[in-house]
């Protein structure tokens, strides 16, 4: 029998110390990684619940194990809320991650060797959209589209490639593209060549849920997303679709038993919590502020003479090219880290450096907006970053910025009393 008093602090001091250090880092550092956010205590409560003990292979009402009557209720809540949130007819809440959701879509609708047309990783796409190092690039014939000289997707080029290569599936989505995707145009191109349209909205799902970014569900054959990032839930995946019995059956089978065994019901419960949070009016206000903050930061970089890819942002993220400054993303990332500002190095279009070094940085505002930053704080923050980028070896500037960061983080904590 377990004692409820047996906490990690009492049982495993080494592990607890590292966990406490990470919690302190999250409070004292400014988080600007576009794919990161802070979940609510309710989301974390669900993830740490007794649901982690329950195995539940199958789907609600069709399980292979007994004792699933309550996890059936929980999973159905998550399904119903996801469908309501995104206006979908179908939702599968079982994928453990966004990449696994994407793999399940490919497994459901493609055969090995089929051609897919997705956005190049070097131009802002994702590994799972056909990158050569990913299974999506190894199992399928991946053709890539990119952005033009102005940093925008060239839809005429997408159409030309689609007509030339006749893909079985067109993938629309990104990990580092700051503009609005034209879902009607993607749909028209897919229809022209008889392809499935698959949209990966992992980065903008929260914006979509709040109505501040176009919803791809009415246009796509299938949509996937993560449940963290802008959606501000647990780390996990989600598949959505319009009513289509054949596709729904294929998707369910591709998730279980095709690519996963038992679902993580404690994470599914946390997804249900985050979907409920996203259905509240204040969530729209939050997402509107996320975009305002990203625009404010990008504007400062442009004013200070830096190159923002695509010339600005219409969502929660943007890419900063440091090619003109001859600064590597790796070195810039490290210098900002010493100032308690967390970013990620990122390749930029026509990057002369390797993906392990890069010539760019990716910024995102979901996390800082969660902790209460508005345009004024974001403009000030962007100015501090510019000061550091002006001389990565000026430790006096880095030290001064670090003290400012600690002060503003203390003023705007992630988790209040």
Curated annotation (Swiss-Prot):
Main location: cytoplasm
Cleaved signal peptide residues: none
Entry cofactors: pyridoxal 5'-phosphate
Keywords: Amino-acid biosynthesis, Cytoplasm, One-carbon metabolism, Pyridoxal phosphate, Transferase
Pathway(s) the chain acts in: One-carbon metabolism; tetrahydrofolate interconversion; Amino-acid biosynthesis; glycine biosynthesis; glycine from L-serine: step 1/1
InterPro entries: PyrdxlP-dep_Trfase (IPR015424), PyrdxlP-dep_Trfase_major (IPR015421), PyrdxlP-dep_Trfase_small (IPR015422), Ser_HO-MeTrfase (IPR001085), Ser_HO-MeTrfase-like (IPR049943), Ser_HO-MeTrfase_PLP_BS (IPR019798), SHMT-like_dom (IPR039429)
Domain of life according to the entry: Bacteria
One Gene Ontology term, aspect cellular component: cytosol
Catalytic activity of the protein: (6R)-5,10-methylene-5,6,7,8-tetrahydrofolate + glycine + H2O = (6S)-5,6,7,8-tetrahydrofolate + L-serine
Main function: Catalyzes the reversible interconversion of serine and glycine with tetrahydrofolate (THF) serving as the one-carbon carrier. This reaction serves as the major source of one-carbon groups required for the biosynthesis of purines, thymidylate, methionine, and other important biomolecules. Also exhibits THF-independent aldolase activity toward beta-hydroxyamino acids, producing glycine and aldehydes, via a retro-aldol mechanism.
UniProt family annotation: Belongs to the SHMT family.
Assembly with partners or alone: Homodimer.
Protein name: Serine hydroxymethyltransferase 1
